[in-house]
């Protein structure tokens, strides 16, 4: 089972394995007060993507697509499959620090883990055609 939770919320036993999935440590959170079992920076969006997104909900759909492309590497897939196996045997809580509970990297990871756990395959990427780019500046 996969849950997502903000880093600043209190830890609960029902959280199971608490895994911080942000590249940066949560601002203002003391390490001795953080109850994380693991800090998995390698699965976080790249610095470039994180800065581009800036937690702007208008960029959410594009962020999801770009982040999924970043997750489409052998190393990231291995990490995702490992998380999915753990979630199949117990509860895994993905911990994030963003203020927006609906537009953050943990939401995308939870969707990807649900897809893997359901035995789903990634949809094939469509080839780009001229004028089809949706990148926003």
What function would you assign to each model-found segment?
Residues 1-137:
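Residues lining hydrophobic/aromatic ligand-binding pockets adjacent to catalytic sites
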